[in-house]
Every structure is written in C-alpha cells, then in structure tokens.
Amino acid sequence: MSGDTCLTAVCPASGAKPKTYSFKGGCLGNKYIRLNVGGCLYYTTVQVLTRHDTMLKAMFSGRMEVLTDKEGWILIDRCGKHFGSILNYLRDDTITLPKSRHEVKELMAEAKYYLIQGLVDKCQAALQDKNDTYEAVCNIPIITSPKEEEKLIESSAKPVVKLLYNRSNNKYSYTSNSDDNLLKNIELFDKLSLRFNGRVLFIKDVIGDEICCWSFYGQGRKLAEVCCTSIVYATEKKQTKVEFPEARIYEETLNVLLYETPRVPDNSLLEATSRTRSQASHSEDDEGFELRDRVRRIHVKRYSTYDDRQLGHQSAYRD
C-alpha cells in the first residue's frame, strides 16, 4: 500500500462523544495516520499533510496541538464531505472540481479554513467561469412515454401546459390552411413558454395519438383540453383540418396560473375553473366524484360538406 494513498471515507456508527487526549503532532513521524474529520474517517501520511504550507502542515509538524480519541483517531472538527478532494490536491496539486456551483463553494470554504491558497484560487476561477457561462433559463421536456408524462405532471409543483403535435397521425390530406395553423400553435407554445417559464411547466408530446391538442393541468390533475383538429368534407372526400383557437388557448393558460399555490385541496378553485355545474341535484358523494373527474374539453370541430350543411354544425361522424 503506497504511502500517498487515501482510503475511501466511511462514517462510523453514531454513539457517545469520544474522549479526547492532548497529542503533539511532532512525534508522528513519516507514517500513516488516521483522521476523523467530522465523523468521516481517512487514512493518509504526514508527508501528504505537510507537503504544502497550510494549517494541516502546522498541525502535523508539531507547531499546533492535535487531539485524538482513545482509539488513536486524530480529530478535526470540520465537515468531512470534501476532505478527500483536499487530500487529492495536497498529494499532486490537481483536483477535479464538482460540477455543482454550490459544492464548489463548499470546497472553497474548506480550503480557506485549511489555508490552502492554491485550491482557493482554483475554486474562485471555476466560480468565475460559471458566472460567465449563460445557462438555459427555459427548458422544455419532450415526452418519450406515457409513464414519463405522468411522473412529470405528478411531481411538478407548477401548473402544466402540454402541447401534443404529431402529423404522422393523419389519415387524410390536410386542408389548405392546416399546415399554417399547426405552425401557429407551435409558435404560440414557444411564446408562452418564454413568457411564463418560471411559473408554468411547459412540455411537448410528439408521440401521442392526436395531431394537435393542448392540455392544461393544475395540482396534478387535468383541467382542460383544447383539441385543434377535426374531419371536414369537401368534394366528397375527407380532409383533416387543423385550427388555431388562440383566444381559447390564452384563456386556459391564464386559468392554470390560479394553481401556482401549494398543492392543497381547494374545491372552490377547482369549481371556479371548471365548467358550470349541472343544476340537477346530486348527492355529496356524486358531487365530489364529478369534481375530481371533470375536465373541460374544448374540441374545435367544424363540419362542412359540399351540400348545404353550415359551417359549425356539430354532427357526429362514423368511419
């Protein structure tokens, strides 16, 4: 076993506070010593600890008093989380800094305590680089599976707006304006995500069963759905029509902002943003069930044929 090897840190079982004894570091010599840093245990050599002019060198060259417990572990009353990284730096002057800005700050605080100026400089340079690097402020998840979608929505503390668009679901030709309207829906989604990215979680779904459909969620449940596609008839053939209900999309997006509050049951809020209750009397259980399962579905479907049927006629069609 090399004299410059530091074993992995382990955390001993909690127990009574160890009894400490005064101990002079000068009598340790160039051999392995055992360190207990905030409950994390390390093996290293005096040679590593005294290689640089730091507080550790003062401790283990006899200039400062060190304390040991009855089992011979030298006690250092600091957090041991980053002490392994500090030993690595003392050993060969190199270190792989953490990716997290917060952890780099933690490491720098420990380096300042031990008076390791070289490591402090490296941490400061890394933090400056992170300041100069612009991180994305608007990240849009793209759904890869229904299970992933469910987890995203359930775990989000924010309201959720989802846009599903998948042109491959179309069986027929598109009407003349459908491509433009599909693009307008996508562009509006991008604009809303930039405007409300700090308040609403926006997600995209490109594997769903619809061609273009908006869904709105609050406190983990679906509140509304705006389907922008329909089947129309022209010259005796079916066509798929994609529309752009801009006002309705804005309305539903503003409605989900009411759900920015913590996720607590609020029947009055759910009722205020749901469709009007039926006037018929129901039992309390029926009302609770209706409230939980109600979703506003706004299907923008208009049917027109080569005959005299008027645009906007709501008629069911079966293939």
From Swiss-Prot:
This is BTB/POZ domain-containing adapter for CUL3-mediated RhoA degradation protein 2. InterPro entries: BACURD1-3, BTB/POZ_dom, SKP1/BTB/POZ_sf, T1-type_BTB. Pathway: Protein modification; protein ubiquitination. The gene is tnfaip1. Substrate-specific adapter of a BCR (BTB-CUL3-RBX1) E3 ubiquitin-protein ligase complex involved in regulation of cytoskeleton structure. The BCR(TNFAIP1) E3 ubiquitin ligase complex mediates the ubiquitination of target proteins, leading to their degradation by the proteasome. PROSITE patterns: BTB. CDD domains: BTB_POZ_TNFAIP1_BACURD2. Residues 31-99 form the BTB domain. It holds the Pfam family BTB_2. GO terms for molecular function: small GTPase binding. The keyword Nucleus applies. Its main location: cytoplasm. Component of the BCR(TNFAIP1) E3 ubiquitin ligase complex, at least composed of cul3, tnfaip1/bacurd2 and rbx1. It is found in: Cytoplasm; Nucleus; Endosome.
